[in-house]
């Protein structure tokens, strides 16, 4: 039986992971969970799965949750904040940590888990975007496996299995194009938050959905793929694929291209990561090729959706530049969600921060955390209306 901690259990990835655990309860034990502030959802999860530990990272939610649990006389130990996260990823009786929190909050707990020798099911792309060099070196040192949960990276992971890595010519990351595919820059000037959150294919949290609308999500995935698969940026390509059926592709030196196809259901890549290297019957709907009308592919419009180009630029610069880009994006997306800036302001803010802040080729975890504070403060102070 595999014993698991889930960071971000009340979010989109976390709740879908629970579906897998329910279906396969003989093979999994949920030992610890975390949520930022979703008290009621977490109470239901604790009631159902009876984990040994639960963490909340927002103080009022933590106090409220603790009060509810004391009234219920639950056995679950309740912890708070980053210290709580660092505790539940390093528990001696867990085998794997699913990191499905959004943003840089996932970086330090993931590092703590790796230092403790726990395998990682990685849904927090910021961990590799911001600290990829440190994280991958640490994983090798501690002989820890990192299994990608993003559908695109899971697809690539599956397509390279059993093949010679040296034979890989290109990686193709597919993207739906988001809700604004085909629009001009002028047509995006006054788009609303509601429009940006209307993703055509995937069910995700708000931050990831906005990132998909700007194509920043794909840019972050390019950087993530660079570190996950040790692949030069020149060999990582993005292809717009509106049907979201082909989740990514790998081209080999003989011209052969291997692709992974499935329905748009995140439970499949989550299940593959949790069960690796076994395949089990999945909860997802099967593809029906006889009713599949079209598979189309097109080049991304990086002039209109500039964050994708900026992500490539940041990745190629290296050092702390991806961290600067990521932190600027987190701050800008938050401002957009609260109607403080316009949609196109996001790319302007990213570019300004990349030009303003000095990039360093050598850095520590503490340096990255300092960058987060500095960049986010700058964006908030300068661009909040």
UniProtKB/Swiss-Prot annotation:
GO terms for biological process: isopentenyl diphosphate biosynthetic process, methylerythritol 4-phosphate pathway involved in terpenoid biosynthetic process. Its EC number is 1.1.1.267. Coiled coil: none annotated. Mn(2+) binds at residues 150, 152, 221. NADPH binds at residues 10-13, 124, 126, 205. Pathway: Isoprenoid biosynthesis; isopentenyl diphosphate biosynthesis via DXP pathway; isopentenyl diphosphate from 1-deoxy-D-xylulose 5-phosphate: step 1/6. NCBIfam families: Dxr, PRK12464.1. Catalyzes the NADPH-dependent rearrangement and reduction of 1-deoxy-D-xylulose-5-phosphate (DXP) to 2-C-methyl-D-erythritol 4-phosphate (MEP). Belongs to the DXR family. This is 1-deoxy-D-xylulose 5-phosphate reductoisomerase.
């Amino acid at each position: 039986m595999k014993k698991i901690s889930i960071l971000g259990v009340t979010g989109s990835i976390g709740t879908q992971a629970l579906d897998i655990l329910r279906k396969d309860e003989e093979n999994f034990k949920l030992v610890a969970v975390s949520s930022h502030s979703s008290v009621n959802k977490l109470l239901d999860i604790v009631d159902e799965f009876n984990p040994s530990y639960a963490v909340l990272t927002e103080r009022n939610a933590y106090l409220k949750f603790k009060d509810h649990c004391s009234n219920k006389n639950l056995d679950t130990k309740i912890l708070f904040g980053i210290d709580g996260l660092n505790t539940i990823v390093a528990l001696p009786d867990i085998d794997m940590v699913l990191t499905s929190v959004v943003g840089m909050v996932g970086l330090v707990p993931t590092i703590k888990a790796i230092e403790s020798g726990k395998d990682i099911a990685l849904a927090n792309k910021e961990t590799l975007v911001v600290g990829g060099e440190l994280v991958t070196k640490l994983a090798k040192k501690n002989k820890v496996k990192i299994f990608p949960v993003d559908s695109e990276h899971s697809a690539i992971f599956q397509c390279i299995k059993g093949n010679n890595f040296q034979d890989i010519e290109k990686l193709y990351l597919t993207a739906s194009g988001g809700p604004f595919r085909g629009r001009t820059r002028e047509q995006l000037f006054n788009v609303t938050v509601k429009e940006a959150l209307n993703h055509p294919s995937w069910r995700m949290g708000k931050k990831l959905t906005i990132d998909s609308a700007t194509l920043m999500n794909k840019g972050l995935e390019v950087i993530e793929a660079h570190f996950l698969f040790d692949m030069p940026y020149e060999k990582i390509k993005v292809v717009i694929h509106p049907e979201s059926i082909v989740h990514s592709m790998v081209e080999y030196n003989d011209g052969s291209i291997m692709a992974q196809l499935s329905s748009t259901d995140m439970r499949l890549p989550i299940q593959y990561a949790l069960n690796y290297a076994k395949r089990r019957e999945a909860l997802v709907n099967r593809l029906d090729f006889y009713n599949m009308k079209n598979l189309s592919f097109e080049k991304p419009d990086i002039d209109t959706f500039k964050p994708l180009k900026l992500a490539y630029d940041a990745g190629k610069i290296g050092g702390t530049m991806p961290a600067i880009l990521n932190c600027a994006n987190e701050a800008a997306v938050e401002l957009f969600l609260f109607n403080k800036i316009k949609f196109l302001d996001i790319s302007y803010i990213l570019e300004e921060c990349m030009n303003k802040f000095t990039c360093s080729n050598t850095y520590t975890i503490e340096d990255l955390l300092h960058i987060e504070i500095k960049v986010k403060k700058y964006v908030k102070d300068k661009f909040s209306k």
